[in-house]
């Protein structure tokens, strides 16, 4: 039992229930009472910030090819929800309304009627490189976001990436307490399988990712980023490092925590923020753990 429960962030919205990153998924997360929501962002060919995880369209839409090669209008013509198979209430919008830009998501959060967090993951490698960061910051600023407090009305904004260069770039513009350095263990076989690479290319890519992991750990060791964002597997495999970062004052946002035993691990470790595909279920579990 604990006296203060961790905050629960909805990973790509309530993405176990509805297709990730869709209007329906985020509206459901808000309705579930999530303390915050997480999103991944890419730039379109005409420089709009869209909410998608993959650099390609194939997995989560009826389109194909790179997100960066399409305009926003072209993306709006695609179906981003039917692949999931779940029907959603009419009030969550039509199929044609499910793709969201960052301004679209901000509109939904501002209407939540309560304080809510927004964790924005900037996806790299990007063909637009650090223009992605500049564009996201410009979108936020246009809405009245204050970079020092990282607040936009009722929305608490944090920015995060697995890319150490992107994180260092953000740290020059936003206080460290609002910047999350994502980190996870890199396994060569997982890289090869996920990216469908051969042994030589897969090994080379894995070595690059391992170097980035080491840089990320250095950033967190030094306290340059205020928020540590490890995967739940990393938390299990590196308890001493996790404890050291916590003791040194890093705030933790752990992903993706769906299984009850993983929630318990986070509670026992004193993790402050949990990112999950199942916000309603995790909220019930962490609520029951509060004294």
Task: Spell out what each predicted region is.
Residues 1-13, 106:
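N-terminal amphipathic alpha-helix/helix-capping segment at the start of soluble metabolic enzymes
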Residues 21-22, 131-133, 241:
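Residues at alpha-helix caps and immediate loop-helix transition turns in enzyme cores, especially N-
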Residues 53-172, 177-187, 196, 200-210, ...:
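Metal-dependent phosphodiesterase/phospholipase catalytic core, i.e.
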Residues 180-183, 189-291:
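C-terminal active-site rim and adjoining tail of enzyme catalytic domains
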